[in-house]
Amino acid sequence: MANEYLYGAYGHIGETVAQSAVQAGTTPVYIGTAPVNLVRDFGKAGIINAPIKITSLVDAQKKIGYSSDWGTFTLCEAVYAHFNNTLGNIGPIYVINVLDPSAGKHRKEMATTKALTFTGGRAEFASDKIILDTLTIAKNDSGNYVEGTDYAVDYNFTKGTVIITSLKDDAQLAGSLTASFSEVDDSEIADSDIIGGVTSSGEYSGLSAIALLYPEQFAVCNLIAAPGWSHSPAVYNAMLTTCKKINGHWDAFVVADLPLVDSTAQAVDTITKAIAWKKANAFTGERSKVYWPQAVDNLDNVFHLSTLAVVELMRADFSHNSVPMETCGNKAIPVIKQYFGANAKNRGFDQQSGKELTQNGISTAVAWGGEWVLWGDHTAAYTYGADVDPRAIFDVSMRMLMHITNDFQREWSPEIDEPMTRALKDRIINREQEKLDGYVSMGALLGSPVILFLESENSTTDVMNGDFRWDIAVTPTPPLKSASVYVAYTDAGFSVYYEGGDE
């Protein structure tokens, strides 16, 4: 409603409305760095080492900041891929930022000075490393101008610029003035920050902060990614550890990358090198997919394929009512070529050569069917011809098993501590059987899976202690990994020349 008397027709330009994103049931958590230095009062916002829900690009700018420097601020790549995607946006996502611009943390010791020229009471300069809370503007004589009284500070995320505007019409900031501010120092961030931990005083950080997601927001993490960091063996192994029984209950699937440069600064820029690196560094977890190389879009943005894979896994899940029955393989991605590093000579490879990667448990991206697509539906544990647990052959198999166990726990956790009557036992069986039949009907499972309450698995001692168990054996539907048709030549068709008699 108007807060002043109006008479006539008026028009007002309001706040930006973010491009809508499809709301998926899949819950990915990204761990990395965000430009929270661009968020005012970041120290009180609870945006460091905590899961933050992001629903749009504008939402990200408000909560964690945004920068086009994805190398420094790795979480911005995920934000862009989910909420500025030419193929369609999808979310929400959760991010855990480990960058802490506080004094003594990830902040440069020496302050930065910047000469400003004010025109019409306004000045603007580019910086995404500035800690906005530390900005001061010196007077030409002595002392500093006062923010909120003499001037206001804003940030343009589209241009990456700081905007300073005078607040007093009769005493505007003018001419040449000097600004002083602190900047973030991302060189201080290490694998250990991403891995994180839990202190004796109950402080969570890095991957360990995923454990805060359910008790604080009642969301169940089922995908974990750390683009820009997951190529580190230490981080990858920590991701595999974290993804098992989060909060003692939830299972998640890891999506990671292989590096373009190894720990000795040697390029990993060929298929042969990538396969060798994967084996040497044991990137073989059955609860994970690994990708190599990276990819570039038409604006020269360089994406980790793990990020694009999470986007397409969410999109595929959404198309099946959040049931992870379809791989992200052969799904279009908004890129124009593969990327092997700034100085790499590799021009890329096709789908046929890409088979060398996929048969060694490395997913990739190729040009196929007139577009660029993700390629590969195996877990990292797969190697063609090797002895692999059948459940670990395809990513959909592992994710379906996780989906069933996670869903069982979410469905029946409200019944814990209720009387375990015969009626409740039967209700659990009937409901779970109904879901299994539904999975078969939609094509997520094959055969006739049955949930069983076995006497052999529910001893008198177990029942006496209130411990009950149900057993389910399922066959997740495999993807159509290959389709072959065999065509043979025959001379039988020549008989048409002799049909119908003489002419």
Positions of the model-derived regions?
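A glycine- and small-residue-enriched flexible loop/hinge signal that marks low-structured segments
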Residues: M1-R107, D141-G143, Y155, S192-P414, ...
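A general secondary-structure signal for short beta-strands and their flanking turns/coil
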Residues: I47, A174, N465-R469
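Short, surface-exposed secondary-structure junctions/capping segments
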Residues: G71-E77, I164-T165, E499-E503
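Extended beta-strand solenoid/passenger and fiber regions
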Residues: N89-F157, V184-D185
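Generic recognition of long tandem-repeat/solenoid scaffolds
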Residues: T117-S127, T158-D169, A367, W372-G385, ...
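Surface-exposed interaction regions enriched in Ser/Thr/Asp/Glu
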Residues: K139-D193
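Compositionally biased, low-complexity/repeat regions
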Residues: S180-T199, L445-E503
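Extended, compositionally biased non-globular segments
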Residues: L401-E457
